[in-house]
Regions:
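P-loop NTPase catalytic core
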Residues: 1-304, 314-318
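C-terminal non-catalytic accessory extensions
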Residues: 313-335
Length: 335
């Protein structure tokens, strides 16, 4: 209930690969009908044409035979590899690998194999690893680089990240987006929890600065937990400013409006530009003592950033809003 499916659809619309391969394993029949109706109507923001022109959907509902459900992911990744050999960049989104693992469990049970943890087959980890390891870049004979990127959704029962499928997946993947029901209920979209999520890949912005910003986010979260016990009155102005900085980073950089054509997807150049201004605002020291004044200042700064997100990159409005933000936070900053 944290928005896995909508997040997947949003990724499909905003990513740049030439071909999309989408296995739906043991999805509810109504869910599949909805996808087949909606997808032809989705517009590719890059070309303005139907997104279905570069999409392959492989559906097996939960009522279909277990062998068909188990084969979904293999069929999809084989098609993805075919298009990779043609020199294309392919994105494969598997929804959901948990149901694929459940199909393997059913098949293993019928074959009377020795069960592993929670009755999943003993070879679950190696099977999941061999699936994800089929992703990657290749250099073709003509010198061109092509790739397959695999993104799998995992649906742990009761949100238990210790169950076998989740643990086997976390051991092999290079990045993890942990969706949070708490953030979804708070209307913070996409509902990716910044504390639970991680990546082994370098981002498009300077990683040293990213780590410094992340430390502010962690410290702000600690202060927030403390404030739930002692209240705002028991918090110093210095700690309250750090808490507000963490909230600012969360609301203006870690959240996006997928219904806004500009904010839904952001180019690397724009990301670097916006993070540079935000980083300077986070690292600045502020001459503020009253908590109402601190709250008002950061709320206004947050609104200015959100207005900035709605402007076209490198337009006069973009640079005017950037200047306005810089002047606003510097008016309260101390050297």
């Amino acid at each position: 209930g944290a928005g896995k499916q909508y997040f997947s659809i949003w990724k499909r619309k905003t990513e740049k690969p030439i071909s999309l391969s989408l296995p739906h394993v043991a999805s509810r029949a109504g869910e599949v009908v909805e996808i087949l109706k909606e997808f032809p109507e989705l517009e590719d923001p890059k070309t303005g044409r139907s997104l279905m022109e570069r999409t392959i959907i492989i559906c097996n509902t939960s009522s279909m035979p277990v062998a068909a459900r188990e084969a979904s992911c293999y069929t999809a990744v084989t098609l993805a590899e075919y298009y990779r050999q043609m020199g294309l960049n392919v994105l494969l989104l598997a929804d959901s690998t948990s149901r694929w693992a459940q199909a393997m469990r059913e098949m293993s049970g019928r074959l009377e194999e020795i069960p592993g943890e929670e009755a999943f087959p003993a070879y679950l980890e190696s099977t999941i690893a061999s699936f994800y390891e089929r992703a990657g870049k290749v250099r073709l004979k003509n010198g061109k680089i092509a790739s397959v990127t695999i993104g799998g959704t995992v649906s742990p029962a009761g949100g238990n990240f210790e169950e076998p499928v989740t643990q086997a997946t976390l051991k092999v993947v290079g990045a993890f987006h942990g969706l949070s029901r708490e953030r979804s209920d708070a209307r913070k979209y996409p509902a990716i929890h910044p504390m639970d999520s991680w990546s082994k890949y370098d981002g498009v912005v300077d990683m040293t600065r990213v780590e410094e910003a992340r430390s502010i986010l962690h410290r702000g979260n600690e202060i927030n937990q403390m404030m739930k016990v002692v209240g705002e009155e028991g918090t110093s102005a210095e700690d309250y400013i750090i808490y507000q900085k963490g909230e600012l980073l969360d609301s203006v950089y870690l959240q996006q409006n997928s219904f806004d054509p500009i904010d839904a997807a952001c180019s690397p150049d724009r990301q670097r530009e916006e993070f540079g201004i935000l980083y300077d605002a986070l690292m600045a020291s502020y001459d503020l003592d009253d908590k109402n004044e601190i709250r008002g200042f950061f709320n206004q700064l947050r609104r200015e950033f959100l207005d900035w997100h709605g402007t076209e990159f490198e337009s006069p409005e973009f640079y005017a809003q950037e200047k306005k933000i810089s002047e606003f936070y510097k008016s309260k900053a101390v050297e």
